[in-house]
Structure formats: C-alpha cells, structure tokens
Design a protein with these regions (language model features):
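Acidic, surface-exposed loops and disordered segments
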Residues: 1-205
Length: 205
C-alpha cells in the first residue's frame, strides 16, 4: 500500500476484534514509524503512554471514556502526551547526528525561540502530537490495521490515573486493531474552494 492509498483508506473505526493481538514486533514497528514524524527543532516532545493493563482500560472506558468500546477492544490503545519543556532538557541530544556547527546553531536558536513563551511551548507540543498521531494511523493502515483517534474522555481524570508529570500536556488517544464492522460511509469533505486561499484572505470592509 502506498502513502496515498493509506491516506484515502484510513477511517476512524469503532468496532474491533477484542481477541486479536498485535505482535510485539509489529508494535515496535508502528512506534518506530511514529517517531519519524517531524517536530520543531527535532525536539520530539511526544511521550506515548501504552495503555496495556486491561483493568486500567476498563476503568477509563466505564468511568471516564463514555463507554467507548474501542478503549477495551482494540489491540493497542495509545495515549499521546507531550513534554512542553523538552526544549530545555539536554537539547544537544536532538542533534547528535548533525555536524557540530549545525547542532550549535539550532541549540542556540532553541532557547530564545521558546523562552518565556508558555503559549508557544504548549502549541508546539500539541502540534507535535498531531503529526505523530497521523503518522501512527497511516503506518497502521499500511500494515493492515485500522485506527481511531479519540478525545472523548475526561482528560483531567485520565491525567491523574497515569500520573501525568508536571509540564506535560494531554493529547488524544489512538486505538489500533482489526476491525469487525465497517465504519459509516465517509460524511464528505468540504470543497477545496472553501478551504484553499491564494496568497491572502479577502478584506472585509
């Protein structure tokens, strides 16, 4: 399956085979593909919480997740979080394979870009989560699996359950597995004419 096929065939699947297990090798392959996603300054803010404990998944589903079946039935349930302060934690490790002059340049830019801009740090973390999520879902599709991004859960309660560290932000979950029911037909995309702007927006006088 090529990239365009994965993009067009990816759907948000709700019903999964609860008995199907993704192998450890496949899980590793999915995660290694996910971390190929781009991040600003190559900071790689994401931290992936693999929700593997059946009791924990059941608790999230029943108490904080609106009883969404994919939370317990999918082979994998991954909660995306990100470290908003990753930019200041051993920054040279993000450029360990780059020429020294390149690493020096980027690391010296990194501090002033983020320093004192809490809103930007949070935005960058969430942007990184979004790109990693899409990478994961496309990789899953290419490997013959389906996925579902989910934000319909009590973020604060789940953050407590997983002991979310200070300075981390919560993102959505992604369920991955073998579907047992076809999703609804695609609801339809807006026409490009509604979405694409050439150069500038029109002024409204």
């Amino acid at each position: 399956m090529n990239t365009l096929e994965a993009i067009y065939q990816r759907r948000s699947v709700k019903a999964y085979d609860p008995n199907y297990q993704i192998t450890p090798e496949e899980e590793q392959k999915l995660l290694e593909a996910t971390i190929q996603a781009p991040t600003s300054f190559n900071i790689q803010h994401w931290r992936f919480v693999i929700l593997r404990d059946p009791e924990l998944r059941q608790k999230i589903r029943k108490e904080f997740g609106n009883d969404q079946a994919q939370m317990t039935d999918a082979s994998l349930l991954i909660l995306f979080t990100a470290d908003t302060k990753a930019w200041q934690k051993e920054p040279y490790r993000y450029w360990q394979n780059a020429p020294q002059e390149v690493a020096d340049l980027l690391v010296n830019w990194m501090g002033p870009f983020h320093q004192g801009r809490e809103w930007l740090q949070r935005d960058e973390a969430q942007r990184s989560i979004g790109m990693a999520m899409q990478t994961l879902m496309l990789a899953a599709k290419a490997m013959g699996y389906d996925s579902c991004p989910m934000i319909g859960f009590d973020i604060d309660k789940v953050a407590e359950l997983i002991n979310l560290p200070d300075d981390y932000v919560m993102g959505p979950m992604v369920a991955i597995g073998k579907k047992v029911k076809e999703p609804w037909p695609k609801p339809g995309q807006l026409p490009l004419s509604d979405l694409v702007v050439e150069n500038t927006f029109s002024r409204k006088d």
